[in-house]
Amino acid sequence: MDLVLDAMEIRVLGSLIEKELATPEYYPLTLNALTNACNQKSNRDPVVAYDEASVASAAARLVEKGLVWESGVSRVPKYEERFTHERSLVPRESAVLCVLLLRGPQTVGEIRGRTARLHDFANLEEVQAALDNLVEWGYAQQLARMPGHKESRYRDLLRGEVEAPKGPADLKLPDIPPIEIARIEKVEAAVERMQKEIEDLKTAFETFKKQFD
C-alpha cells in the first residue's frame, strides 16, 4: 500500500486502537496517557521508552496523514485514531490489525490469544476471516512459512512490505506468562485511572483559580 509509517507512528496508532477497544472509558487519550500506552511493558514488541515530545511529534505526523485526530475541546488536547473508522473496519478487524501493529508478525493462534482483551473471537476461523479481509484490502500480508514451522505468520503492511525472514534470527524470546500479563495489566489500568483522576483534578483546580483572576 502507498501509506508507509515509521516505527514510532506504528506504535502510536496501534496504542490508540488498543485503548479505544480495551478501555473506551479512558479514551480518547491525553499526550501523557498516550505516551504511557506506547511504553507499556505488556503486549508490546519491542518494548520502548519514548518521551512525550517524541510521541507528540509522531502523533502530529499521523494527524497530517489523516490517521489521527487531535481534539482541542478540553483544556488538555486528546488524541483518537481515525484509521479504522475512515476505512470502516469492524471491531474484529481492528483488533487483529492492532496486535499486528503492536507485536509484529504472528500466527493465527497467537493473534487469537493476544486479541482476547479487544474482541471475543469464537474460534480460529473468525480470526482467519478477519485476516483474509485485511490481506484483501492491503493492510496485512501472509509471510512465507519458515523452515521447521507448521503455521504461516501474518504482518501488517502499514510499515511497508518486507521479505519474510528466512532463518533463526527471527526467533523470539518466550512470551510473558498469562498470569503475569494479567497482573501487569491490572496495575497499568489502575495507573491509567489515577492519571485520569489527576488530570481531572488539575482541570477543576484551573477552573477554581479563574474565579479569583
Could you tell me what each predicted segment is?
Residues 1-10, 22-25, 43, 48, ...:
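Eukaryotic, polar/proline-rich low-complexity intrinsically disordered regions
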Residues 6-25, 87-104, 136:
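Positively charged, polyanion-binding regions of nucleic-acid-associated proteins
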Residues 23-49, 105-121:
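Short acidic, hydrophobic short linear motifs in intrinsically disordered regions
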Residues 56-59, 63-74, 131-146:
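A short, conserved structural fragment
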Residues 74, 81-110, 152, 156-182, ...:
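Short, amphipathic alpha-helical interaction segments positioned at domain boundaries
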Residues 83-130, 138-141, 145-147:
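Extended, charged alpha-helical interaction scaffolds
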Residues 114, 144-158, 199, 203-213:
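Helical coiled-coil/dimerization "stalks"
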Residues 173-211:
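Amphipathic alpha-helical oligomerization/assembly segments
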